[in-house]
């Protein structure tokens, strides 16, 4: 029982350190410049993440939820748009998955 208690305390300390390292947030204004507040299911934990840069994969699901946070990822950075990448050949079958920040 003593070992289990020590393990539990150690585990809790690790969890607290990891939460602090990722910069939890409640809204975008809690984050640094160039970052947004993102809710990442299934853990329903919100962390500050960087806005996406040119050429990075993006998704239209990077929209606000009712709590004023982004879901899964930040949108493209300032002046960029999430657009379908122009592809041809066999990869054209996967066009819906070829969204990038341009």
Swiss-Prot record:
GO cellular component assignments: extracellular region
InterPro entries: Atracotoxin
Family the entry assigns: Belongs to the neurotoxin 20 family.
Alphabetized UniProt keyword annotations: Neurotoxin, Secreted, Signal, Toxin
Lineage: Eukaryota, Metazoa, Ecdysozoa, Arthropoda, Chelicerata
Gene3D superfamilies: Lipase, subunit A (2.10.80.10)
Segment forming the signal sequence: 1-21
The protein's name in its UniProt record: U3-aranetoxin-Ce1a
Principal location: secreted
Entry GO MF terms: toxin activity
Tissue-specific expression: Expressed by the venom gland.
Domain of life of the organism encoding this protein: Eukaryota
Subcellular location: Secreted
């Amino acid at each position: 029982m003593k070992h289990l208690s020590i393990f539990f305390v150690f585990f809790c300390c690790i969890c607290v350190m990891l939460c602090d390292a990722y910069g939890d947030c409640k809204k975008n204004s809690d984050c640094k410049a160039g970052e947004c507040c993102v809710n990442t299911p299934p853990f329903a934990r919100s962390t500050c993440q960087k806005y996406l840069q040119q050429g990075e994969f993006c998704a239209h699901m990077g929209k606000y939820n009712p709590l004023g946070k982004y879901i899964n990822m930040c949108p493209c950075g300032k002046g960029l748009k999430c657009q379908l990448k122009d592809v041809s050949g066999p990869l054209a079958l996967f066009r819906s998955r070829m969204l990038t920040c341009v």
